[in-house]
Amino acid sequence: MPKEKDGVIYTINLRRLYWGRRSNRAKRAVRMVREFVARHFGVEPEDVKIDNTVNNYLWSGSITKPPARVQVYVTVKTESGEEGERKVAYVTLANVKDVED
């Protein structure tokens, strides 16, 4: 698991979505991204915050034709609240020019 505040680029393969029925593929793509990040960073799926750019990219081909893969940039931060401290993963669309700076 990466250190806190270090960003990681992942390429998530969404081709498996095309095995199932056509309806709700984009919705399932969002769920797959959320579960992938939660599994790789050890956070709860509810604590994965997906940026609007990632959501728009996944829905760009309509509900039945999401992209086959997506490259995302993930950062993890610790937030404190009423329930104590918890890790939250932030997912943004990976743009290599922005990430390398």
UniProtKB/Swiss-Prot annotation:
- The reply to whether Ribosomal protein figures as a keyword in the UniProt entry is yes
The record's NCBIfam families line, in alphabetical order, gives: PRK01192.1-1
Q: What gene does this protein come from?
A: rpl31e
A Pfam family annotated for this chain is Ribosomal_L31e
What processes does the entry annotate via GO biological process terms? Answer: cytoplasmic translation
Instruction: Recite the UniProt keywords alphabetically.
Output: Ribonucleoprotein, Ribosomal protein
**Which InterPro entries does the record cross-reference, listed alphabetically?**
Ribosomal_eL31, Ribosomal_eL31_dom_sf
Q: What is this protein called?
A: Large ribosomal subunit protein eL31
Q: Which GO terms describe its molecular function?
A: structural constituent of ribosome
Q: Which domain of life is it from?
A: Archaea
